[in-house]
Amino acid sequence: MMDINEIREYLPHRYPFLLVDRVVDLNVEEKRIRAYKNVSINEPFFNGHFPAHPIMPGVLIIEAMAQAAGILGFKMLDLKPADGTLYYFVGSDKLRFRNPVTPGDQLILEAKFISCKRQIWKFECQASVDGKPVCSAEIICAERKL
């Protein structure tokens, strides 16, 4: 388990773009992670998306999954951004949205390592709320030295 202070050691993102609040399960041997994002009405994006019917933007759900996958990648390599390595989100395959995410939801983020070739990492990711699927995708990240 990782609290927000440890997460901040593994992700360079900060408010309002840090989208992982807690890691509840991380297994390097099984190459998987489970984390969550508590979605609050105070999120800045709800001011414009949409004021009368607030919904978390899909691109931010994808980013949250990518951040969880990034933590897994750093843990697998036993590195941190402070060591001079970053993961850049470079694409996604098989992307699907199934249900909206609204204020008060706890967005569960799961990622499993698929492959790494020439510093291009691929993860199978899912996001859910209350056991209902919200989004799934293969997230592709590039490992880069600073």
From Swiss-Prot:
Regarding protein family, the annotation reads: Belongs to the thioester dehydratase family. FabZ subfamily.
* Cell location: Cytoplasm
Q: What is its EC number?
A: 4.2.1.59
What Gene Ontology cellular-component terms does the record carry?
A: cytoplasm; membrane
GO MF term list? (3R)-hydroxyacyl-[acyl-carrier-protein] dehydratase activity
Report which gene this protein is encoded by.
Answer: fabZ
Q: Catalytic activity annotated for this protein? A: a (3R)-hydroxyacyl-[ACP] = a (2E)-enoyl-[ACP] + H2O
Task: Identify one Pfam family in the record.
Answer: FabA
| GO BP of this protein | fatty acid biosynthetic process; lipid A biosynthetic process
What InterPro entries has UniProt attached to this entry? FabA_FabZ, FabZ, HotDog_dom_sf
Task: Write down what this protein is called.
Answer: 3-hydroxyacyl-[acyl-carrier-protein] dehydratase FabZ
What's its job?
Involved in unsaturated fatty acids biosynthesis. Catalyzes the dehydration of short chain beta-hydroxyacyl-ACPs and long chain saturated and unsaturated beta-hydroxyacyl-ACPs.
Q: Which residues are named in the active-site annotation?
A: 49
EC category: lyase
Keyword Lipid biosynthesis present in the record's keywords: the answer is: yes
Q: Which organism is it from?
A: Pseudomonas fluorescens (strain SBW25)
